[in-house]
């Protein structure tokens, strides 16, 4: 069996350097959906292939050659376009001992950053399953490597994958020059961005829902095989930079690794005003989606509507559903595991104490274990807040993406964090972590998604705050009735109200663990004019039935209006509200169900009734108050 190709009408041109001579033109054929043919003749093999030739200075170049015109003889002298002479040299490929490469499920392979990934196979209906290999890269991306079983002519088919890398290029001691690989990848990346193709969920380039690949045909003398060094996992390519010495299984991975030493970023974003550059073609393609807004990778999990820019981000997200944590901490006695190797790498620094990222601000001297934390810290010095909320009328800015990400759910009302024990959902990851600790005694840290797109769950509508919200209306006659929702926070174990906040976000309270402990038996609330008020209470006042009045104390310590404390039953509240209903601008409770009422307060003649839902824990009260201080308006159930 062999892999055939059908030529498209268009052909792309690129150049490869040829030593000191001018660059040689090479034709790359963008091929449509692959087909399979039997026998010694390759079906539908039209078009121009690449021929390796040795130039006069000893370097290797690649020239156009049509196989129909006959074969070039090894050592033959040919005339190039610039008039110079070149010598034909066939790239030798070792003979196969039989079957083609078959990487077993779970087999370890070395990736470009030096870490180990494992092979796994995925189903592709339109391809010969024995010739497709799936490699899960470190960031979660699944790369599909094609290994041709046999190429009779003898040609070697080199497939440029959707991530811009070249598969099937390196065999034995005779490898294609790394500069050639780089040129091929740059061309593939440019075609991927400039062309009209989309990227399918399979990770291959597709158009009109047909899977496509870019292929190059190189003239050779033998069948495509894989050297035994690769089958045994031996690493044949060593980094020659001083103090490094890392080994890689392919010249391509070594080439990419060397860019970490040289700082070379050959893939430049051509979007107007951007100018960012990347070390790999896949990095450029992923970045380009930040300009287009494209998020083609959607989670297929039921009731999950998240989308992602890369397949790697999607696969990392899927692990939040499956619970898979394939990257284990190697430190003896730790036992922690993680969804990505990068998170594991940062975690390992908690064992070693390594903090490689130092702040260069004079007088600062702080160091960080992760680049993300370092960059976020630097913005404290610069005052930069590059992340802006795009919701109309909001315009809030943040120093780090995670803060914008967390803020975004305030507008969408999504609850993306779910408990893997009981299924409860939460808006904030900190609330989920608190729930897991208190309800399930689970102290395992929760990893946050930083590249997510949220949509409100269907049918949720505008019913945002639940549990602890009430609606009150002014007692003014006519149609000028103002309706406001009030979110409340209670202290666990006590029946009194701790904080009162209106939903419009104009009222703020600064509360901490120490503040909460210092309050003791007091009631803290914020009135409608924004004045914080502390109400001293007594157990007898709160616990006894009936209506009681206490003097409000403002933040400045001056005594103010009277606050009516109502016993926790609806009848008592109705009696109290009836008495106070004769006061000007009184407010009456509007509720659809009977719930305990804890507090009735007056502020400048306005009465406020608070109806409680479920009482949260003390930690949740502190967390909600902290969010309110940041300008958010949470409910108790988020």
From Swiss-Prot:
GO biological process: positive regulation of smooth muscle cell proliferation; positive regulation of snRNA transcription by RNA polymerase II; positive regulation of transcription by RNA polymerase II; regulation of DNA-templated transcription
Molecular function in Gene Ontology: chromatin binding; DNA-binding transcription activator activity, RNA polymerase II-specific; DNA-binding transcription factor activity, RNA polymerase II-specific; RNA polymerase II cis-regulatory region sequence-specific DNA binding; zinc ion binding
Domain of life: Eukaryota
Modified-residue entries (N-acetylmethionine), positions: 1
Zn-finger segments (C2H2-type): 237-261, 267-291, 297-321, 327-351, 357-381, 387-411, 417-440
Record keywords, A-Z: Acetylation, Activator, DNA-binding, Isopeptide bond, Metal-binding, Nucleus, Phosphoprotein, Repeat, Transcription, Transcription regulation, Ubl conjugation, Zinc, Zinc-finger
GO CC terms in record: nucleus
The keyword Zinc-finger is assigned to this record: yes
Subcellular localization(s) per the UniProt record: Nucleus
PANTHER family xrefs: TRANSCRIPTIONAL REPRESSOR PROTEIN YY (PTHR14003), ZINC FINGER PROTEIN 143 (PTHR14003:SF23)
Similarity comment text for this entry: Belongs to the GLI C2H2-type zinc-finger protein family.
Subunit structure comment from the entry: Interacts with CHD8. Forms a complex with HCFC1 and ZNF143.
Protein name according to UniProt: Zinc finger protein 143
Species: Rattus norvegicus
Lineage, opening ranks: Eukaryota, Metazoa, Chordata, Craniata, Vertebrata
């Amino acid at each position: 069996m062999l892999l055939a190709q059908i030529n498209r009408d268009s052909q792309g041109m690129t150049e490869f350097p040829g030593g000191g001579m001018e660059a040689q033109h090479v034709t790359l054929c963008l091929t449509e959906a692959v087909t399979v043919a039997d026998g010694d003749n390759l079906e539908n093999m039209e078009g121009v292939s690449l021929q390796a030739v040795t130039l006069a200075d000893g370097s290797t170049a690649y020239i156009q050659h049509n196989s129909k015109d006959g074969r070039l003889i090894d050592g033959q002298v040919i005339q190039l376009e610039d008039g110079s002479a070149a010598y034909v040299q066939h790239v030798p490929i070792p003979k196969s001992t039989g079957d083609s490469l078959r990487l077993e499920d779970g087999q370890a392979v070395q990736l470009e950053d030096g870490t180990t990934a494992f092979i796994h196979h995925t189903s592709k209906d339109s391809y010969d399953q024995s010739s497709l290999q799936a490699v899960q890269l470190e960031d979660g991306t699944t790369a599909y490597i094609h290994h041709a079983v046999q190429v009779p002519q003898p040609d070697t088919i080199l497939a440029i994958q959707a991530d811009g890398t070249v598969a099937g290029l390196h065999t034995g001691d005779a490898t294609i020059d790394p500069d050639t690989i780089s040129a091929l990848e740059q061309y593939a990346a440019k075609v991927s961005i400039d062309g009209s193709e989309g990227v399918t969920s399979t990770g291959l380039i597709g158009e009109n829902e047909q899977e496509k690949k870019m292929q190059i045909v190189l003239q050779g003398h033998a069948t495509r095989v894989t050297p035994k060094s690769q089958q045994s996992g031996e690493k044949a390519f060593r980094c020659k930079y001083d103090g490094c010495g890392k080994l890689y299984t392919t010249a391509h991975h070594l080439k990419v690794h060397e860019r970490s030493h040289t700082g070379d970023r050959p893939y430049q974003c051509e979007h107007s005003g951007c100018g960012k550059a990347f070390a790999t073609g896949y990095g450029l393609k992923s970045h380009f989606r930040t300009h287009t807004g494209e998020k083609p990778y959607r989670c297929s999990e039921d009731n999950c509507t998240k989308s992602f820019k890369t397949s790697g981000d999607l696969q990392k997200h899927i692990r939040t559903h499956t619970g898979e944590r394939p990257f284990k901490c190697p430190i003896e006695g730790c036992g922690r595991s993680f969804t990505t190797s990068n998170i594991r790498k940062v975690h390992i620094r908690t064992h070693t104490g390594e903090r490689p990222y130092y702040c260069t601000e004079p007088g600062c001297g702080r160091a960080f274990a992760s680049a993300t934390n370092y960059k976020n810290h630097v913005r404290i010095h610069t005052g930069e807040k590059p992340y802006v909320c795009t919701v109309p009328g909001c315009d809030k800015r943040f120093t780090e993406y995670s803060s914008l990400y967390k803020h975004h759910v305030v507008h969408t009302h999504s609850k993306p964090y779910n408990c893997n024990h009981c299924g409860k959902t939460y808006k904030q990851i900190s609330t989920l972590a608190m729930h897991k600790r208190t309800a399930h005694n689970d102290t395992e840290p929760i990893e946050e998604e930083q590249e997510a797109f949220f949509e409100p769950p269907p049918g949720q509508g505008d019913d945002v705050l639940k549990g602890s919200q009430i609606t009150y209306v002014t007692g003014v006659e006519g149609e000028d009735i103002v309706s406001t929702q009030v979110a409340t926070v209670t202290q666990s174990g006590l029946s009194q109200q701790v904080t009162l906040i209106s939903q419009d976000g104009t009222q703020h309270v600064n509360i901490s663990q120490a503040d909460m402990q210092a309050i003791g038996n007091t009631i803290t609330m914020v009135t409608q004019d924004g004045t914080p008020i502390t109400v001293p209470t007594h157990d007898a006042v709160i616990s006894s039935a009936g209506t009681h009045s206490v003097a409000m104390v403002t933040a400045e310590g001056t005594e103010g209006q009277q606050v009516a404390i109502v016993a926790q039953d609806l009848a008592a509240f109705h009696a109290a509200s009836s008495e106070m209903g004769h006061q000007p601008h009184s407010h009456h409770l509007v509720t659809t169900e009977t719930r305990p009422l804890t507090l009735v307060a007056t502020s400048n003649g306005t009465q406020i009734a608070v109806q409680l839902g479920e009482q949260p824990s003390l930690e949740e009260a502190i967390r909600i108050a902290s969010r309110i201080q940041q300008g958010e308006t949470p409910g108790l159930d988020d």
